[in-house]
Regions:
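Glycine-rich Rossmann-fold phosphate-binding loop(s) that bind the pyrophosphate
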Residues: 8-9
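Conserved N-terminal Rossmann-fold NAD(P) cofactor-binding segment
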Residues: 33-71, 300-307
Length: 309
């Protein structure tokens, strides 16, 4: 198996490192536009192989897409962060050009690849990748909800005093601090509803802290997080390559599911060798469905910016 990670920044490099450590692929390519960055990080990772015991061959490349040929899965992390004074339209315009170019170049050399989108704004970049490439919808996956759900489990574990691994909890909707919807009503701790163990105030606090999880980290460390986003991308790669059929929240194309069409939003899906394989309807209540519709409206307004480019 062969995996490519486009973008050798903190998120991309962390994702690649997780993939290598787990021995998910025989070959791993790290690609970046900045001269020497991908090559240097690839060599650094390869020098851990003797210490960590993996055999994945990691290659770095400066913008040479021929090195990515034959990739089974491609993780796209490319794009610029939003800078002070930059409008939403400017951010979308800049990153849309980057993501579209990356996807087109990748598919020239790996026409059968499954694409995992991490670039922001993630919901809109996933929609762009789908519409610009014309790929079957199951081969375009936005990572956002996988990360948001992991952050939700972290917040729950802190209040419950339990292992995050013992929790089942998902976040649906858009990948943004005003568009995500942590479904605390459906969250369980080894099959028991978490709401049995948490006060109403605690539940509200957990939801609020989950929604600003990314912003909280940016404030603390001065830049966007990278460990959890990178790990989330690698977890999706693992479920694809090992055909695990694991359940994740991912940003995928909807065609009537959850009452939405012509949009990519975070919903529960199974992830296997064919990409995303099945959307699960968790049965939102009236309040949750209203929030989901509001989230869709916000994401759709972001997508509308693409039409002006």
């Amino acid at each position: 198996m062969k995996v490519t990670v486009v973008g050798a920044g903190a998120v991309g490099a962390t994702c690649a490192d997780n993939i290598a450590r787990a021995a998910l692929a025989e070959e791993l390519v790290l690609l970046d536009i900045k001269e020497g960055l991908a090559e240097g990080k690839a060599q650094d990772m390869m020098q851990t192989a003797a210490l960590l015991g993996f055999d994945t061959r990691i290659t770095g490349s400066t913008n040479d897409y021929s090195k990515t040929a034959g990739s089974d899965v491609v993780v796209i992390t490319s794009g610029l962060p939003r800078k002070p004074g930059m409008t939403r339209e400017e951010l979308i315009g800049t990153n849309a050009g980057i993501v579209k170019g990356v996807a087109e170049n990748i598919l020239k050399h790996s026409p059968n690849a499954i694409l995992i989108i991490i670039s922001n704004p993630m919901d809109t970049m996933t929609y762009l990748a789908l519409t610009a490439t014309g790929l079957p919808k199951n081969r375009i996956i936005g990572m956002g909800g996988t990360l948001d759900s992991a952050r939700f489990k972290y917040q729950l574990s802190q209040h419950l005093g339990c292992s995050p691994a013992d929790l089942n909890a998902v976040v649906v909707g858009g990948h943004g601090d005003t568009t995500m919807i942590p479904l605390i009503r459906l969250a369980t701790w080894n099959s028991a509803p978490v709401t049995k163990f948490l006060s109403t105030e605690q539940q509200k606090q957990i939801v609020a802290d989950t929604m600003v999880g990314g912003a909280t980290l940016t404030k603390l460390i001065g830049t966007s997080a990278w460990y959890a986003p990178g790990a989330a991308g690698a977890a999706l790669v693992e479920s694809i390559l090992r055909d695990e059929k694991k359940l994740f929240t991912c940003c995928v194309s909807l065609n009537g599911e959850y009452g939405q069409k012509d949009i990519c939003l975070g919903v529960p899906v199974t992830i296997g060798r064919n990409g995303w394989e099945k959307i699960l309807d968790f049965g939102l209540d009236a309040e949750e469905q209203a929030l989901f519709s509001k989230s869709a409206d916000a994401v759709r307004s972001m997508n509308d910016v693409l039409k002006t480019l």
